[in-house]
From Swiss-Prot:
Biological source species: Aquarana catesbeiana (American bullfrog)
Function recorded in the entry: Stimulates the secretion of gonadotropins.
Annotated GO biological process: hormone-mediated signaling pathway; reproductive process
UniProt gene name: gnrh1
Keywords recorded for this protein, A-Z: Amidation, Cleavage on pair of basic residues, Hormone, Pyrrolidone carboxylic acid, Secreted, Signal
Residues modified to Pyrrolidone carboxylic acid: 25
Xref: InterPro entries: GnRH, Gonadoliberin, Gonadoliberin_I_precursor
Signal peptide: 1-24
Entry GO MF terms: gonadotropin hormone-releasing hormone activity
Protein name, entry field: Progonadoliberin-1
Length: 90
């Protein structure tokens, strides 16, 4: 009796693993196994992309309030330390 249970359990495990492996490979249209595309299909898709890309002029943004980086770091550190001290008091 225990041998039959073992065989049934092993068969169930094999079926579960095999069904997982069967559905694990996904092939899309135009793809070969492993996700490799054919060279011809890639050349066609690149031919559709325009060769020239127009770049817009970059806008230089400035902050209206001049701040020093060191003061920003100092303020952030002070805020963090105040939070740590408040936690220690609780």
């Amino acid at each position: 009796m225990s041998r039959h249970v073992t065989v049934v359990l092993l068969l169930a495990i094999v079926l579960l693993l095999s069904s997982h492996m069967i559905h694990g490979q996904h092939w899309s249209y135009g793809l070969r196994p492993g996700g490799k595309r054919e060279v011809e299909s890639l050349q066609e898709s690149y031919a559709e992309v325009p060769n020239e890309v127009s770049f817009t002029e970059l806008q230089h943004l400035e902050c209206s309030i001049p701040q020093n980086r060191i003061s920003l770091v100092r303020d952030a550190l002070m805020n963090w330390l105040e939070g740590e001290n408040a936690r220690k008091k609780i």
